[in-house]
Amino acid sequence: MKMADGSTILRRNRPGTKSKDFCRWPDEPLEEMDSTLAVQQYIQQLIKRDPSNVELILTMPEAQDEGVWKYEHLRQFCMELNGLAVRLQKECSPSTCTQMTATDQWIFLCAAHKTPKECPAIDYTRHTLDGAACLLNSNKYFPSRVSIKESSVTKLGSVCRRVYRIFSHAYFHHRRIFDEFEAETYLCHRFTHFVTKYNLMSKENLIVPINVGENAAPGESEA
Amino acid sequence: MGTNSGATAGINNKPVGGAGGAGVLGGGGVGGANSSIGGVLSNSLGGGGSGGLSISGLNAGGQNANVGGLIGVGGMGNVGGDDGGNGMVGGGPNNQQATTPQYTIPGILHFIQHEWSRFELERSQWDVDRAELQARIAMLLGERKCLESLKSDLTRRIKMLEYALRQERAKFYRLKYGTDPPQLNEFKPSNEDAGLAGEVATDSEVPYSSVSNTTWRQGRQMLRQYLAEIGYTDNIIDVRSNRVRSILGLNNNAEHDGSGGGLGGGLGSGTGGENLSPNINGNESNKRASETEGRHTPAKKVQQSIDEIIVDTEAAVMANFEFLGATEMSDDDEISDDLEMVATDNDDTDVKMAKRAKSGKDMLTEDLEADVGEQLLNDMNLMTEEVDGSLGLGELAQLTVNNESDGAYDANSKDGSGGSAGGAGYRKTWNAKYTLRSHFDGVRSLIFHPEEPVLITASEDHTLKLWNLQKTVQAKKSASLDVEPLYTFRAHTGPVLCLGMSSSGETCYSGGLDGNIECWQLPSPNIDPYDCYDPNVHSGTLEGHTDAVWGLTTMQSNIVSCSADGTVKLWSPYNKEPLLRTYTASEAEGAPSSVDFVRNEVDHIVVAYNSAHCIVYDTETGKQVVRLEAAQEMSGNTGKFINKVVSHPTLPITITAHEDRHIRFWDNTSGTLVHSMVAHLEPVTSLAVDAHGLYLLSGSHDCSIRLWNLDNKTCVQEITAHRKKFDESIFDVAFHATKPYIASAGADGLAKVFV
């Protein structure tokens, strides 16, 4: 976006940038990114370009460490889920949703506490996101964003399972919010596809009816 | 009862008859508080003069006329002629007072009481004035004496160095020719020596003043304690030093020779305004001055105290000092205990320096370092360099550097004593202590609580987080000095770009890419991170901007924000109509990029625009007050883009951080560029000034933060703090207002706190 001098492209959001110009700069090929945050940059760049192109966003570049790839994607999911939480805050109150439920089948207990607790849905949402933020930024489990320990990669699955419940709660209890949010971000789409692709959650847990097959079909031909 | 009767009598506001007039005149004089009363009284006396009345000080008739008017009592007019001094209430009609109003005794009493209290008030005011002036005289006297004693101190040092040099030369001579040099023990240096000594003195002028700075710093701190004891609080001292700083600020950056040249200049710029504080303490400085003067006058006595120490410690050294002769031990008795402390301290240094000089074939910095205190060490280092400098006659550049850092120490120690910031006060090196990791994306802004060790960060991940540095949540998922956030503020639907906090620390405001400003009530800093959701934390949204809000700053209950929609808005967040005013510049200026309140001028804000100009607005009138621009400097302003503007907390100075790697300083009154410096390797993105206005912190996309001494605009410390994401690195820096914390926020999603 910012052309400073000659051919150098400086990818900066200077103060005063209009919101439509935020992060609007020419894509940078992953191989040219020399930052330790290259994967995040790359993923965000793809999402910025077209959030609906879930398949492309989830296509792992060659020679990419899969652990890092999954980790950075999960960070991005949790980050974008803040948007859903903001919307839910307005509507989902402890009086209307006293428990974290999706279908009537399960009541989810909040794992953020010493002993799992039956938090109201909004608290569950916030605690889960806060806990995920702490875990994914933990110096102990994820000290580096360039390489991830194998033991830590296993943590990603449980984070996925927990944050997925936010989608499912929104879908079953706050459908309008869910639909609006999904139309903008394709986040549940992308998430479902992500966990399926990397086998982070079992299929029977994916209760939000997203037609993965439809989106996945062209993807599978590539992959 | 004289007054009473007088009052009763004193109802005539004009002297009656010729005799009366004479009486009035006879008593004429200025009697302070009583004079007017006297005037009133005496009027009644008529021909009798002032015989019966004790109060005879008179004012002019005109004032009496006033009095009559005030009293407003009629019919009591007194022809006091016959009554003489009795002060009897004359019932007779007063033909000259046809218009005189009725007088009543209570009315008169009331009047007199009133007048009395008024005079009392005036008198006490006068007393206060007098005390102030006296204090000022004492101050100025002390100031003079300080300078005198400084001069003598310097002279003493020069003598010492001359001596050291002679010793060196002698040694050199011995080593080279194997014989004692001629004239070794003569006190009067040979012509050659004299010439060299002179040379040394001139060459080392700068280091001399810096050494004395160190000495003065000790003395100053001590005097500051005395002052505190006698009730001169830091505030008063600060006011004075601020004044001096502002004076110095005018000939900004003039460094040593600029502000008065030579000795005075060194004193002024090196040690700031604090030199003045000792002066208040008359006694001490008197004693000290007389003492030093006593030493000073006979040149030989300069070394007397050194000799005294030497007697105690090293006879050999003493032998070397013999030529300095006369040790007047009796002088010491005159020195008060407190001063002895100071003196001993200094002398100690001097002796060490003397030893050094004596054995100083080479640079002997290391071996002595072990056994001397830090402060002394500092002295010594400077001293060594002096010696070396004078011997080698060079290295001035190095000395300058040292001077600068010396100034930094100075300001630092001042900072330590001024704020609650602890610290032994000497060199403060900031070290990263806390890493705040919990954001998923770049941290755009951070702000400290005004009192608590608490801060808030705002990130591109759409959230704000609250951190308590005292609650390093050791638990489950974090390593040692990581801090876990206590609370996550969610309301923005896009990246959060800027933060502000109320002066009470109860409320904070955040501006986002979504164009909204959210208002938050801070949860308790001891909240459980996984507590229930309290919707009241989010206490409102200020809607009005139609594009990203990039700048936000607070002053008392108001906040001012700037947005990519081209406007700057002033808000009073909890009003019914929160938006107070909108300021819009011409199209040519582009969008505002940053905004700050002008801290030393109420109702002024300074706004930086894309055009690389700053404009100061009056918030009340909405008028442009001054435009900060420098034609030649800013010509072709592409790339000079301003990333951040801050106002100096006490001086009329605006500081701007530029895309072209510069930090620039502007004079708010004239709108001119005061100083410009290349500060970083890449664009400067953020600035913060500490609460005392002594230090500037800057952050840049070159991944480093730098701490600057505002006095001499030198970099005190550089810390590499963050990593790059795209071409961005550091977004914000901050000072804690009352605690020794600084912090930086980076594009890598981390915030760091340094102590």
Curated annotation (Swiss-Prot), chain A:
One of its GO terms (molecular function) is metal ion binding. SUPFAM superfamilies: Mob1/phocein. SMART domains: Mob1_phocein. Disulfide bonds: none annotated. The keyword Zinc applies. Residues 1-21 are annotated as: Disordered. GO terms for biological process: axo-dendritic transport; cellular response to nutrient; microtubule cytoskeleton organization; negative regulation of hippo signaling; negative regulation of synaptic assembly at neuromuscular junction; neuron projection morphogenesis; positive regulation of insulin receptor signaling pathway; positive regulation of neuroblast proliferation. GO terms for cellular component: cytoplasm; cytosol; FAR/SIN/STRIPAK complex; terminal bouton. Keywords: Metal-binding, Zinc. Zn(2+) binds at residues 92, 97, 169, 174. Pfam families: Mob1_phocein. Belongs to the MOB1/phocein family. This is MOB kinase activator-like 4. It comes from Drosophila melanogaster (Fruit fly). The gene is Mob4.
